[in-house]
Amino acid sequence: MSRETGAVCRMCRRSGDKLFLKGDKCVTKCVFEKRPKPPGPQLGRPRRLSDRGQQLRQKQSIRWSYGMTERQFRRFFGLANAQPGVTGDNMMILLERRLDNVLFRLGFGTSRAQARQIVMHGHILVNGQKTDIPSYLIKEGQEITVRETSKATAYFKTLAENIEAKAIPGWLSLDRKTLSGKVISLPNAGDIDARFDAQTVVEYYSR
């Protein structure tokens, strides 16, 4: 299954929740707030979702939020399931460790989709080595920096001026002057987005 490439606002409407897939535009121009119902014809009262339907909706919401294909998402579930501990928490921690997500958390992109493009275009170094794989899993102690040649571009010049307002999670640190971040520690269950119920994903894939 390929990555979703249609109107991302439809994903929010299908999930029944605001997923912030378009970054700042989700604050100023949110289609979901105007049209929260699912896309398509509205025929009478909405049907009540079955347990399986609720599990699917939650799984899709998490997958869309992190911008992953079904195959990629299923692989991450398999990695989480092979680890000791709570599978749902393991999976969310792995998702948070993705390089594109770390850039998003640091404020280098207003959305995970934008952060993914930054990685794929070769602007990012991890411990001094160019890394252009968005799904790369960061490790404790690693440093994420912007290439010196990239800092001269208009995007990163603007970013350096505006990044002050971004709140950084406790497991990361940010040097705003050098546009670099460091992984102080790996994220834990307490850092997981409270909107997501990863246990429903475990139940979905366990059937």
UniProtKB/Swiss-Prot annotation:
Keywords: Ribonucleoprotein, Ribosomal protein, RNA-binding, rRNA-binding
A molecular function (GO) term: structural constituent of ribosome
Xref: SUPFAM superfamilies: Alpha-L RNA-binding motif (SSF55174)
Listed PROSITE patterns: RIBOSOMAL_S4, S4
UniProt record, GO biological process: ribosomal small subunit biogenesis; translation
All residue ranges annotated as the S4 RNA-binding domain in the record: 97-163
Pfam families membership: Ribosomal_S4, S4
Keyword Transmembrane listed: no
Residues covered by region (Disordered): 35-54
Example of a GO cellular component annotation carried by this entry: small ribosomal subunit
NCBIfam families given in the database record: PRK05327.1, rpsD_bact
Subunit structure: Part of the 30S ribosomal subunit. Contacts protein S5. The interaction surface between S4 and S5 is involved in control of translational fidelity.
Annotated family: Belongs to the universal ribosomal protein uS4 family.
Entry-linked PANTHER family: 30S 40S RIBOSOMAL PROTEIN, SMALL RIBOSOMAL SUBUNIT PROTEIN US4M
Name of protein: Small ribosomal subunit protein uS4
Taxonomic source organism: Dehalococcoides mccartyi (strain CBDB1)
Lineage: Bacteria, Bacillati, Chloroflexota, Dehalococcoidia, Dehalococcoidales
